[in-house]
Amino acid sequence: MPNTSSESLPRDLAEDVVKEVNRDQVKIAAVQISGYDKGDERREGYDAADELIPYIGRAGEDEAQLVVFPEYILGHIKVPSSSTEKIATAAAKHSIYVIVGCWEVYNDDTFANTALFFDRDGKIMGKYYKTHAAVDHYEGTPAWSRPPSDKSREWFLKNDPEWIMNRGNDLPVFEFDFGRVGILTCYDGWFPEPFQVLSLKGAELIVWINGRGGSVEDFIMKTAMFQSHVAMVTANQAYGSGTMIGDPSKWPTRILARCPDKSEAYISATIDLRRIRKIRSTSRNFQERRPELYGKAVEPMSNNGPCNS
């Protein structure tokens, strides 16, 4: 599974906009919008990328450095494709980073739940593959140990695609020109360890993209910001809610902007990376860690569950 794409746009596409990089005060935008969902097939004549382009332009005019879109939203696509080329063109035009989710389809018809990172020149600078599968159906003991055995590939694609997706095996941190960024996708954020690992790898900002009904949990976001000293951005599809931007430098943490309703919305806010870096460099939490006590957290769980091993 490739990690990066060499596809990029001609430099002159980005010549109209040249942004001065401020590594201390960084404006971030997030968009709550619906496109393709978890089990959706491609619809002829519909490209969800077309829905995103105006928001990339709005974020650029808003002088944001990064704009974040939800999980799944581009649907099942090859990378690169006409959809990614549209995003790349808009990113280059407005000299802005873009993070957006899709089902990335490979030549052998396998696929992954992928977050694409576009840099200011429109190049796909990296990818993140969802690591924890949010499956809905199972059989066997213990629970969730294996998928239903009597279902076809077509059934899984429509009803429970994460059973058969290629799962990621890494929690990478990406170097942006304003700072270090990690990413998680939906169910990944229900585990405390990924937030901690990304922070310990140097992430100053964690992006958490979602595609689900209900609201993204602000208590998870606040806990992660407080314990791991990272800023956070969440983005959800518009049939849900809870798109947020948060800053841990406001004691104990603060949600700077949010979308509380199930509707299409755009938010932006400025995070204080200078202060976050200072907090990270002087954190008692980091200095007083006792990793020799935490081994149980990374041991596989026995078939009898965590309390009976």
Locate predicted features.
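Active-site catalytic loop in hydrolytic enzyme cores
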Residues: 10, 106-201, 210, 219-223, ...
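Beta-strand-turn-beta hairpins that frame and shape the catalytic cleft
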Residues: 17-28, 173-182
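C-terminal beta-strand edge segments of enzyme domains
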Residues: 2-19, 146-148, 223-224, 236-309
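Metal-dependent catalytic neighborhoods of phosphoester/phosphodiester hydrolases
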Residues: 71-87, 108-111
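CN hydrolase (nitrilase-like) catalytic-core segments centered on the catalytic cysteine
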Residues: 80-99, 180, 185-273
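A short, N-terminal amphipathic alpha-helix
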Residues: 50-63, 89
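Acidic/histidine-rich helix-loop elements
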Residues: 34-47, 139-150
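Short, conserved active-site loops that position catalytic residues or coordinate cofactors/metal ions
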Residues: 30-37, 59-80, 209
